[in-house]
Amino acid sequence: MRKEADIMEKKNLDWSSLGFGYIQTDKRYVSNYKNGSWDEGTLTSDATITISECAGVLQYAQTVFEGMKAYTTEKGQIVVFRPDLNAERMVNSAKRLEMPPFPQDRFVDAVKQVVKANEGYVPPYGSGATLYIRPYMFGSDAVIGVKPANEYQFRIFCTPVGPYFKGGAKPITIRVSDYDRAAPNGTCLLYTSD
C-alpha cells in the first residue's frame, strides 16, 4: 500500500494495552442492494444502522460476515493479507443463504478504501496490535415468513485491536480424529450467524 511517511498521523492510543474490542473509527463503507442491484457504495462517518423491526437479519438471521486485519510492516507499509480470499468466501456464504453476492472486486476495493480512510488507526509496527476489518452483509427490509429478503446492506467497519488472547494463546494437547460430524452441504464453510 503506502509508506508510513505518506500516512496520516497515528491516533493517540495506547497501542500496547489494546484489548480485542470495538473502538469507533472515522469512516466505514456502506452499499445497498435494492431493485436487483447494488448501488455505488460510499464511505460514511455515520456508524448507526436503522432498519425495520422485521428486517430479515433480525427475524431470520440472514447475515454473513468476514474478518481480516491490516498491519504496518517493518518498512512502514500498511498491508492486508489476501482480502480476495475473504471476498470469495463471502460470495459463497451469500449464495448459500440466498443473498445477492457483493462483487469480489468491489469488496477488495472497499476494504482498501476503509483502511486508507482510517490509516491513523492502523497500529505501528511492533506494537502487537492490528486494525481489525469486519465486512458484513444483512437482509435489511421487512420479511415475515421464511424467505430471503429483497433488500440488503453491505458494510465494512474497522477497529484497532490488541491480541484476541492477552498474553498469547496457550498450547493444548489434542487428539485429531477422521470422524466428521458436520452435515453434508452444511454451513461449516460459511461465516454466518447460525
Please tell me what each predicted stretch does.
Residues 68-71, 80-96, 175-186:
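Residues forming anionic-ligand binding surfaces in small-molecule and nucleic-acid pockets
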Residues 39-53:
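Short, hydrophobic/aliphatic alpha-helical segments
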Residues 2-43:
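Short, Gly/Pro- and small/polar-rich lid/capping loops
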Residues 54-66:
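Conserved phosphate/anionic-ligand binding catalytic regions in large, soluble enzymes, centered on
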Residues 32-39, 71-76, 83, 140, ...:
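Short acidic-glycine loop/turn motifs at beta-strand connectors
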Residues 191-194:
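Conserved small/polar residues in nucleotide/adenosyl-binding loops
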